[in-house]
């Protein structure tokens, strides 16, 4: 089953003080089946993050379609979807993880994860239980659960970010360069987390600068330079 299909995606940005328009992505096309992991590769500034932010609707694309097979709405074009539909999907079906953790100050690690569930309408008791499960699952030190994230290391912030995004059990998870600026030990932990998500059957679309990190994880690779998608067989991409 095709979970996500991107057809002819285009997005441009206007730099007003230069009176100039820059084309970030153009005619992007790929598809992802349920349970697959698609890795997007390309140089800095090639538009990788623009694609993910267009899927999440942080950016509203100028052209094309982003067809998502929603459990709630059926097949829906995320570009044409209403704000109400997008909010629902973010809360219930689509998660987003970046290298940055933007959270409310003076909110503890535990509270941040619980709030993600309370927004979905879960009871306080269910939110408490599921939060503890998620933090344990991603090996967050229990001594940090009631601490503030501004004291965390980069790896600890990323674990919290992933726990917040996945505690809702999203069907589709977008990973926007989550390993940037992490040391090798933290990267290994992230890889283990992603492997756990794959085992759960989560559909993943991710951006990583480290090609070696992606080896053995991705089912498909989309190359921004060639605008082509390859199927990964025994660690080597082959054109699909």
Each model region followed by its residue ranges:
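The feature captures the beta-strand-to-loop junction immediately N-terminal to the Walker
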Residues: 41-43
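Helix-to-loop junction immediately C-terminal to a conserved catalytic motif
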Residues: 56
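ABC ATPase NBD Q-loop/coupling interface
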Residues: 65-88
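Q-loop/switch helix immediately C-terminal to the Walker
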Residues: 107-118
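Conserved ABC ATPase "signature" region
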Residues: 125-143
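Conserved ABC ATPase signature
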Residues: 148-152, 156
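ABC ATPase C-loop
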Residues: 165-166
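Catalytic Walker B motif of ABC-type/P-loop ATPase nucleotide-binding domains
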Residues: 173-176
């Amino acid at each position: 089953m095709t979970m996500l299909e991107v057809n002819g995606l285009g997005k441009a940005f206007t730099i007003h003080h230069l009176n100039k328009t820059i084309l970030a992505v153009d005619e992007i096309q790929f598809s992802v089946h349920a349970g697959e992991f698609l890795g997007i590769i390309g140089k800095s500034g090639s538009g990788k993050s623009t694609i993910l932010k267009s899927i999440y609707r942080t950016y509203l694309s100028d052209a094309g379609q982003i067809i998502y097979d929603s459990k709630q709405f059926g097949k829906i074009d995320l570009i044409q979807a209403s704000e109400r539909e997008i909010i629902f999907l973010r809360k219930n079906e689509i998660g987003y993880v970046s290298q940055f953790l933007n959270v409310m100050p003076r909110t503890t690690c535990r509270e941040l994860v619980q709030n993600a569930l309370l927004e979905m309408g879960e009871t306080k008791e269910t939110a408490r239980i599921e939060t503890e499960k998620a933090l344990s699952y991603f090996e967050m030190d229990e001594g940090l659960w009631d601490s503030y994230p501004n004291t965390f290391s980069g790896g600890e912030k990323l674990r919290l970010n992933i726990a917040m995004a996945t505690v809702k059990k999203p069907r589709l998870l977008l990973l926007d360069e989550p390993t940037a600026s992490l040391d090798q030990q933290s990267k290994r932990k992230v890889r283990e987390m992603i492997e756990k998500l794959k085992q759960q059957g989560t559909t993943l679309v991710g951006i990583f600068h480290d090609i070696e990190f992606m080896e053995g994880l991705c089912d498909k690779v989309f190359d921004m330079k060639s605008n082509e998608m390859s199927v990964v067989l025994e660690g080597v991409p082959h054109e699909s």
